[in-house]
Design a protein with these regions (language model features):
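An amphipathic, aromatic/His-enriched active-site/gating alpha helix that lines ligand/cofactor pockets
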Residues: 27, 33-36, 58-91
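Short, surface-exposed ligand-recognition loops at beta-strand->loop->(often short) alpha-helix junctions
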Residues: 11-20
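Active-site-flanking beta-strand signature of metal-NTP-handling nucleotidyl enzymes
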Residues: 5-11
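Glycine-rich beta-strand-turn "strand-cap" elements at beta-sheet edges
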Residues: 2-4, 43-49, 77-95
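Short, glycine- and small/hydrophobic-rich beta-strand elements in well-ordered beta-sheets
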Residues: 30-52
Length: 95
């Protein structure tokens, strides 16, 4: 089964702060890395634009990624509406 890589950009929504996002996303991270299909889940904050974040993710399969999206902790993060998704790239490792 092919692994799935994700690169996603998040931007803090109006009325929220990067501090709020970091607190919530750290909780999301702590639960996500325990998911069976999660190989890697890295959260990075842009140095020059602190209201922007990048997620680097590696999943065992598309089904594992979907299970992550459906997980209660992911849905709870989405419900906070702290960030908007600026892009999502599904990637395949070639070397």
């Amino acid at each position: 089964m092919k692994k799935l890589w994700i690169s996603a950009g998040l931007v803090t929504t109006q009325g929220h702060t990067a501090v709020e996002v970091k607190e919530a996303i750290r909780l999301l991270h702590s639960k996500t890395i325990q998911e069976a299909g999660c190989i890697r889940f890295e959260v990075l904050q842009h140095q020059d634009e602190p209201n922007k974040f990048t997620l680097w993710e590696e999943w065992t399969s598309e089904a594992a990624l979907q299970a992550h999206y459906d997980a209660p902790h992911t849905q709870a993060y989405f419900a906070l509406s702290l960030t908007d998704v600026s892009y999502i790239e599904k990637l395949e490792q070639i070397a």
